[in-house]
A protein has these predicted regions:
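Glycoside hydrolase catalytic-domain context in secreted enzymes
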Residues: 1-515, 522-529, 534, 579-1021
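Short beta-strand elements
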Residues: 536-579
Length: 1021
């Protein structure tokens, strides 16, 4: 009997322990419920709408099935590459290929078989096999379009597949790639192109196979990736390979040998050599351009999942290329002024514990990209500013444009020819417009589209020199693309540009606020012209100035401004007087007279030095280290209302566009303080439910090439009884489709088509409705400051106006479908090196005229209701905490009134949540459940007790929640909701499991205890 009693006692202890664990599991699960639900695909609550006669679905899809949706995306992907591929060289009309030639294709280069179709990270290609829109690579596209391909070469390259594999460690996850990869931020570029010797060892007859397949297409690839970079010059190359490569974006000997092998084969077989550039970072290709044996060069970017269909159409002539370069293709990238300060420049007194790691001084001022090359060229022609000095020269001799630029910004060829005539230009400062009319005539033999690029050249005066205001010799003012024009036919294109894009920021000029910092227009002659790129445009202007250049002075219009103008743009469209907001971004503000910024007044004397091995001052260290965690008591906290019972829900404000409507204040008064603290502190992956106002969870998706985070069906509605027109059945074959399939943003930029950009916004909007995900961190509006940032594929261009035009078109079109499209990253995400903490320094003029101008239009013109900030610092201040940038420029000057998230920082101290909320950041990227315990585990000071002391903080919290819920109310997150919608708790299978375990272990504990006690009683008897 003793053994039985011991058994029951042991079982009682065991079951009681398990009961305790199962009881304790409940609160633990509740703390991580949101993350658990996302991982398991379960739901712990639901928005339930009572029966109603009103139309619950404000936003409607253009498609009645997922098949139609995917077909439209596939079609757009093909057309994006048809119009976004840039034909750079086409000697003797080598392209398009004849029908016979399409059957004789020899593909050379491992990127022909293993192409780069998206970024390695952040915007990687979604491979959607087994759906209604399978993605294709180059070979698959050629086969589908009926091309004949050299199978011997294909077998050779496929046999080397193992040699192409690269393993990349992405934060502990080992990713395998079978295409060329970009180096990590601390790495160098290593060529993967097989050598001639390697190819001979596999098949020594491979060259003979090109006798019958005598159209040799050589693909040269360079990948891009988030959290990666190319370093300028030889420092960025794996020297151990000994491949005579002087820059990671230049050719290696293996690539040269491959091109030369194709040229040699051409001499024997009478064929053609086409070089295809599969890249997003502008490469050094002057030797290819000047190689007489190369007949054609095509820049295809990263075509995404369907773009190779378009590339094939261009080769065959089914499509006529109409793309133009979004970047200058320099002879030597490392010689640009911006490249003098692109690298790993750590502080001598770095402190990694608070992310004080590195700096980058943008000493080139406004002169990045074509603004440098074309301005310096103009000054050499004009004989001013020591422009022909040797600094920055690729030859070591006097600087000469032809030695520095292979292909200019905006350049692109067609299979036909066009003639553009600038008929008129009207400048209307009162309405802030510049209106131009351009006649475009197809003077060739093939139908095609043309791009009209309107450029301006503004006065550079003694005032500018004295006040350190820089002026580009030419700048893109706006652009449009024609319809398809038949041979001999014409089209008149009207361009209406923003006149503010002619203005220059003058940090010393007085303004309406009585301080300094203003937009100015100098008195003098303003020139307007059109051309096939910036170089043709500047030559037209120089010709009009009676300079001896190859320009067309008859294609120039002028406008005279009699008096200096500092009033036309002194007040923003939002009614806010402008003033300096970014003076602390200038390193000279912290370390006096440290930086000499480049000026066209003296190219030689102001040429940038490399600012490295700097020691941050005590003031800088203090500013960078401050986490703003001290929440001081202030004001009258009781004056800020929380928890009111006003009987409203967010559905009452559905579609209300007036943010000053007093009902918003009534609704916000219902919020609890806990809800505000939780929502601002934990915003990663979704906005989460707010019960007091029945605000829905809005799922976030990432990736500039499409919704890359989740499959189409993961959050889709599968309940047809709801009346949702975008229900996806559980057995729908496209549930697992992922949208990361579009060509990279550089290709979208190369289309120079606002219409195609708008179609992409439409596609995103439709997909959002079907996927039930309302937020897309998708439009990259940073600039290609240099070709070396390995994240350039996520951004359109080196030019702000092109960035603004394409970005705004996408966002505006997406609005029609209720998707919240966020431009990112605000601002100056110019490098991935040390990106969490790097201090970016620049002048306010450069900041406003270059990168910020690209985002400004997305807010002012497209009314973006979402924005993402950056990892980096602006000067010494984390972007989240920079009041000048976020509160004063973004909100007050531009009128932004939407939700805003930090980037994926997840570092509590670096996030600086107190200042972030003050500046309008509505949520961090941290994740956790809807509990204060989850918040305080990250930010112990972000508590009800501390917040309750500060009227300022309470006011800021309610303001950010207004921004966030205003955005949601004007989005498709509200589809299916009405004022009758309420939240109902749901038991998931794991809730039922825990409940079952509690009951089971409870019963077993009681039973075992009873048996044990019964045994004791028998013993006593």
């Amino acid at each position: 009997m003793s053994r039985k009693r011991n058994l029951w006692r042991g079982l009682t202890t065991l079951t009681a322990s398990l009961l305790t664990v199962s009881v304790a599991a409940g609160p633990v699960v509740d703390s991580y419920r949101t993350d658990i639900d996302k991982f398991l695909g379960t739901k712990s609550s639901a928005m339930v709408t009572d029966s109603t006669d009103e139309d619950l679905y404000t936003y409607k899809s253009d498609y009645s099935s997922t098949t139609e949706l995917l077909d439209s995306i596939e079609d757009l992907g093909e057309r994006m590459s048809e119009e976004g591929t840039v034909l750079l060289k086409n000697e003797n009309n080598a392209l398009p290929l004849s029908k016979d030639e399409t059957q004789k294709l020899s593909l050379l280069g491992f990127s022909s078989y293993y192409p780069v179709q998206g970024g390695d990270m952040g915007s990687s290609l979604s491979v959607n096999k087994g759906t209604d829109a399978d993605t294709v690579d180059f070979v698959e596209a050629l086969n589908a379009k009926g091309f004949g391909i050299n199978e011997d070469l294909q077998k050779l390259y496929k046999s080397l597949e193992a040699d192409f594999k690269t393993e990349v460690n992405m934060w502990g996850n080992i990713m395998e790639y079978y295409h060329i990869t970009a180096p990590a931020t601390d790495g160098v570029f290593a060529s993967k192109e097989p050598s001639q010797e390697k190819m001979d060892s596999v098949d020594d007859k491979w060259k003979d196979s090109m006798d019958d397949y005598n159209v040799m297409l050589v693909t040269i690839g360079r990948s891009s990736t988030e959290n990666g970079t190319y370093l300028p010059g030889v420092d960025g190359v794996d020297a151990s390979q000994d491949l005579n490569q002087t820059d990671p974006l230049g050719l290696s000997d293996d690539e040269r040998d491959l091109i030369n092998a194709a040229v040699e084969a051409k001499e024997n077989n009478g064929g053609k050599v086409i070089v295809m550039l599969n890249n997003a970072n502008a490469m050094e290709i002057d030797e290819i351009k000047n190689n007489d044996g190369v007949d054609a060069i095509m820049e295809i970017g990263f075509p995404g999942g369907y773009g190779f269909y378009g590339v094939a159409d261009i080769l065959s002539g089914e499509a006529n290329p109409s793309g133009h370069l979004t970047d200058t293709y320099a002879v030597t990238n490392a010689n640009s002024p911006a490249a003098q300060n692109f690298g790993n420049y750590e502080w001598t007194n770095a402190d990694p514990s608070v992310n004080i790691n590195a700096e980058e001084v943008e000493a080139e001022d406004i002169y990045a990209g074509y603004k440098y090359y074309e301005t310096r060229y103009a000054d050499t022609v004009l004989g001013q500013g020591n422009a022909d000095a040797t600094v920055g020269s690729s030859t070591g001799k006097a600087w000469n444009y032809d030695d520095e630029v292979s292909y200019p910004f905006g350049y692109g060829l067609s299979y036909t020819t066009f003639e553009q005539t600038l008929k008129s230009v009207d400048v209307d400062l009162a309405n802030r417009t510049v209106t131009a009319e351009v006649d475009v005539k197809n003077t060739g033999d093939v139908a095609g589209k043309d791009v009209v690029q309107l450029y301006t050249s503004v006065p550079y005066t003694d005032y500018d020199v004295e006040n350190k205001v820089e002026k580009s010799a030419v700048q893109l003012l706006d652009y449009e693309k024609t319809d398809m024009i038949e041979p001999g036919e014409s089209q008149t294109v009207t361009i209406t540009a923003d006149a503010q894009d002619m203005a220059s920021w003058d940090s010393s000029c007085e303004n309406e606020a009585g301080t300094t910092g203003n937009w100015i227009l100098d008195n003098g002659t303003y020139y307007f012209t059109v051309g096939n790129g910036a170089h043709e445009a500047v030559n037209n202007v120089l010709a009009a100035q009676d300079q001896d250049v190859e320009g067309n002075k008859d294609n120039v219009q002028t406008w005279e401004l009699g008096d200096f103008d500092s009033s036309s743009f002194a007040v923003t469209l939002n009614g806010t007087p402008v003033e300096n907001q970014l003076q602390d971004a200038d390193l000279n503000n912290w370390m006096e007279d440290t930086v000499t910024y480049l000026s066209r007044n003296d190219w030689e004397g102001t040429w940038p030095e490399t600012y490295k091995d700097l020691t941050a001052t005590d003031e800088m260290i203090s500013t960078m280290a401050d986490d703003y965690s001290d929440i001081e008591a202030n004001g009258d906290p009781s004056s800020v209302t929380f928890g009111a019972d006003n009987g409203m829900t967010l559905a009452n404000m559905k579609g209300v566009e007036d943010i000053t409507d007093e009902r918003w204040s009534t609704l916000m008064d219902q919020l609890t303080l806990e809800e505000c603290l939780i929502r601002t502190g934990l915003g990663g992956t979704s906005t989460k439910v707010i019960e007091s106002i029945t605000s829905p969870e809005a799922i976030q998706n990432d990736g500039p090439n499409g919704f890359n985070s989740y499959p189409l069906g993961q959050y889709a509605n599968s309940d047809a009884s709801t009346g949702d027109p975008c229900v996806i059945a559980e057995d729908d074959p496209n549930r697992d489709y992922k949208m990361g399939v579009m060509a990279n943003e550089t290709v979208i930029g190369q289309t120079f088509s606002k219409q195609l950009a708008a179609e992409w916004g439409k596609a995103v909007g439709n997909y959002s409705l079907w996927a039930n995900t309302a937020i897309w961190w998708g439009v990259g509006t940073n600039l290609h400051r240099t070709p070396y940032n390995a994240r350039n594929h996520e951004y359109f261009s080196e030019d702000a106006v092109l960035t603004a035009g394409q970005g705004a078109a996408i966002i505006k079109a997406g609005h029609d479908y209720g998707v919240l499209i966020a431009p990112k990253h605000l601002a100056f995400n110019d490098t991935e090196i040390n990106r969490t903490g790097i201090a970016e320094f620049m002048t306010e003029q450069a900041a406003r005229e270059n990168e910020l101008r690209g985002t400004q239009s997305c807010i002012e013109d497209a009314n973006a209701l979402a924005v993402m900030t950056t990892y980096n610092r602006v000067g010494c201040v984390t972007s989240n905490a920079h009041t000048g940038l976020l509160l004063n420029i973004l909100h007050k000057e531009w009128g932004f009134k939407g939700l805003m998230s930090e980037d994926f920082i997840q570092d509590p101290a670096y996030t600086k949540i107190r200042m972030a909320v003050h500046n309008g950041v509505t949520m961090t990227c941290n994740t956790g459940d809807n509990t204060m315990a989850a918040v305080e585990a990250v930010w112990p000071y972000w508590s009800v007790e501390n917040a309750s002391q500060s009227e300022e903080l309470l006011t800021d919290l309610k303001q950010t929640m207004l921004y966030q819920n205003y955005a949601l109310a004007n989005s498709n997150a509200m589809d299916g909701m009405s004022t009758s919608t309420h939240i109902e708790k749901l038991n998931t299978w794991y809730d039922n499991l825990i409940t079952g375990l509690r009951i089971g272990f409870g019963v077993l504990t009681v039973l075992c205890a009873a048996m044990y006690l019964l045994g004791l009683k028998k013993k006593e008897q």
